[in-house]
Structure formats: structure tokens, C-alpha cells
């Protein structure tokens, strides 16, 4: 059997009449008690009976209200959490239901279109993983921590006198990175002072600004760092560390690369002067 559709005005009218009848029958008890007690000679007893009847009526109404609230909440808990009321029985209006279906399909299409960004998303401070977004440039390794990389470069130069694995000078403890760098290139006429100051400013901004390093600033910092190394190799011979032996296989390979770069630089200078 199909469900009977009752008009809204009929349901509201029936509910109003039912509530009025309930209130009328509920008021009969206190009115009758007050009338009977008023005919009795004892005033204290009359007052106690009236107050008791009023309290009993109040407790009854409160219990009914809380009971209805608890029943309503228990019924609401039976509804599935992921249930979306868009069926024909939930939305009898065909036009509204069709519009909702259309918007849901549109949202599904938008979610598919926006699942992959048009451009590579690079958050400040860290290079993205290799598998996210689309294949971008391979200039930097995945998950590279920009600030940690800058700190390692500065600490190696400050305490070991090594700039990008090229042994350059005897470090002087107690000097800042900027002072150490200015002292190193003070006698080098090939170094552009503006680029040196830009390099130092970038370093101090990256280390002490308190904000994550952007990819552009980090790349510019590395470009200037490589440029300073090339300038220093034009006038300073790359020597081995004071110990005379590399500390590891990595240091040995680094010194070999430094000598290769230095020899190439000398060849380029001789060719240009010829």
C-alpha cells in the first residue's frame, strides 16, 4: 500500500487541536483540587494540597517533555551518518531533486579536474617529493631542506674554511660568516662586491628572518655561492687540508674536482690572454 499524502494544513490543524485537548484535560485536575480544597476549613492543609498538585503537574509535564526529547534523539541516531536525503521520498519535488543531482555531478567533475594542479606546487622551505604534481625540473633533489643546506654551507666555511667542498683558507674561530667571507675575498679583485653583499644579505635573511626559505631565494643563494667559488679559484690555489690527507673518500673526490676546476680556469685565462 502506498503512503497517503496528507495536506500540510490538515496535519497542523490536527496537531493544534490535539495539544489544546491535552492542555484542557490536564487543567481539570488542579482546578478540581483547588475547588474542593477551598471548601475545607483548614487553610494550611488546603495550601499544601494546592502546592502539591501544582508540583505534581509540573513534574508530569517536564517528564513528558524530556521523554519526547530522548525518543527524538534515539530516532535520529538510527539514521545512517552518511545518508544523503536526495531520494524521491525525501524530495518529492522533481525539479529540486534534478537540480541537486546536477550540482553533485558538477562537483564530481570539478574534483577530478582540480585533483592535479596546473603548475608545480612548491612550498617554502622544502623541495616537493618527486612523485607529486607533474614532472618539474630536476635542478634540486626531492625533499631538500633549504635552510639546513644553507646552514651546512655556512658552518663548513666558518669552522673549516671550506666553501662548497673547496678548501680555501685557515678558519678563524670567533668571526661571523659575513666577516669570514669578507676577509677571504678582500684581496680578490675579481669578486664583484655587489654580488658579495647580495650573497651575505641573502644568507642573513635565510638564517635569521624566521620565515621559510623560498625556492627562488635558495637558487639565487646557490648561484652566488658557485660564482664566489669560481672567482676565488681565479686568484687562489686550492690547497689540501692542513692534515695533508683527505678525511674521507668524499673529501678526496672533492679535492680532485677542485683541482680539475682550477686547471680549467687556468686554461681559460691563458686562452683569453693569448
Swiss-Prot record:
It is a multi-pass membrane protein. One of its GO terms (cellular component) is membrane. Residues 35-43 are extracellular. It is found in: Membrane. The chain crosses the membrane at residues 14-34, 44-64. Keywords: Membrane, Transmembrane, Transmembrane helix. InterPro entries: DLT1 (IPR038869). Residues 1-13, 65-274 are cytoplasmic. Its main location: membrane. Belongs to the DLT1 family. Required for growth under high-pressure and low-temperature conditions. This is Defect at low temperature protein 1. It comes from Eremothecium gossypii (strain ATCC 10895 / CBS 109.51 / FGSC 9923 / NRRL Y-1056) (Yeast). The gene is DLT1.
Amino acid at each position: 500500500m502506498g503512503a497517503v499524502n496528507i495536506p500540510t494544513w490538515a496535519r497542523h490543524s490536527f496537531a493544534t487541536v490535539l495539544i489544546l485537548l491535552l492542555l484542557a484535560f490536564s487543567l481539570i485536575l488542579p482546578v478540581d483540587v483547588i475547588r474542593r480544597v477551598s471548601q475545607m476549613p483548614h487553610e494550611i492543609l488546603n495550601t499544601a494540597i494546592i502546592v502539591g498538585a501544582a508540583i505534581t503537574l509540573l513534574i508530569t509535564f517536564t517528564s513528558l517533555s524530556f521523554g519526547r526529547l530522548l525518543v527524538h534523539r534515539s530516532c535520529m541516531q538510527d539514521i545512517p551518518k552518511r545518508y544523503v536525503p536526495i531520494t524521491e521520498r525525501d524530495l518529492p519535488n522533481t525539479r529540486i531533486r534534478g537540480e541537486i543531482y546536477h550540482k553533485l555531478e558538477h562537483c564530481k567533475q570539478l574534483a577530478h579536474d582540480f585533483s592535479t594542479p596546473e603548475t608545480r606546487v612548491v612550498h617554502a622551505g622544502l623541495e616537493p617529493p618527486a612523485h607529486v604534481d607533474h614532472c618539474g625540473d630536476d635542478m634540486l633533489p626531492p625533499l631538500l631542506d633549504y635552510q639546513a643546506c644553507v646552514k651546512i654551507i655556512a658552518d663548513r666555511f666558518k669552522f673549516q674554511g671550506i666553501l662548497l667542498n673547496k678548501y680555501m683558507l685557515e678558519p678563524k674561530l670567533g668571526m661571523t660568516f659575513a666577516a669570514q667571507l669578507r676577509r677571504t675575498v678582500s684581496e680578490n679583485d675579481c669578486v664583484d662586491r655587489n654580488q658579495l653583499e647580495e650573497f651575505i644579505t641573502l644568507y642573513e635573511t635565510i638564517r635569521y628572518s624566521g620565515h621559510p626559505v623560498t625556492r627562488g631565494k635558495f637558487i639565487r643563494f646557490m648561484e652566488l655561492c658557485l660564482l664566489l667559488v669560481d672567482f676565488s679559484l681565479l686568484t687562489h690555489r686550492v690547497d689540501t687540508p692542513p692534515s695533508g690527507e683527505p678525511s674521507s673518500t668524499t673529501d678526496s673526490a672533492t679535492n680532485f674536482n677542485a683541482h680539475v676546476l682550477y686547471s680549467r680556469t687556468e686554461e681559460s685565462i691563458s686562452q683569453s690572454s693569448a
